[in-house]
Amino acid sequence: MFVKKGDKVKVITGKDKNKEGVVLAAFPKQDKVIVEGVNVVKKHQKPNQAAPQGGILEVEAPIHVSNVMVIDPSNGEATKVAFKEVDGKKVRVSKKTGEVLDK
């Protein structure tokens, strides 16, 4: 999967199109990511020990990884990602600028 936790991404399709956010969690087996402030849904929480009040919460739901693009940190634009080997390590590289995305 080309998206990792902590990446800044742009949503390219769906109800939250053109929104940007940081990846909070990535689920490679399901090909889904949770993006901060994107795909917010209302969750009905029953009262329990942790939250005795309960109520309706707004939480981010996962979206499919094909609906987001990584934002290139050098120019701030959405870009495709390629994998290259640098110094014997597999790293992610921006296809627009050739900049290495991994820290």
From Swiss-Prot:
GO terms for biological process: translation. Keywords: Ribonucleoprotein, Ribosomal protein, RNA-binding, rRNA-binding. One of its GO terms (molecular function) is structural constituent of ribosome. GO terms for cellular component: ribonucleoprotein complex; ribosome. The keyword RNA-binding applies. Belongs to the universal ribosomal protein uL24 family. One of two assembly initiator proteins, it binds directly to the 5'-end of the 23S rRNA, where it nucleates assembly of the 50S subunit. Part of the 50S ribosomal subunit. This is Large ribosomal subunit protein uL24. It comes from Enterococcus faecalis (strain ATCC 700802 / V583). The lineage of its organism: Bacteria, Bacillati, Bacillota, Bacilli, Lactobacillales. The gene is rplX.
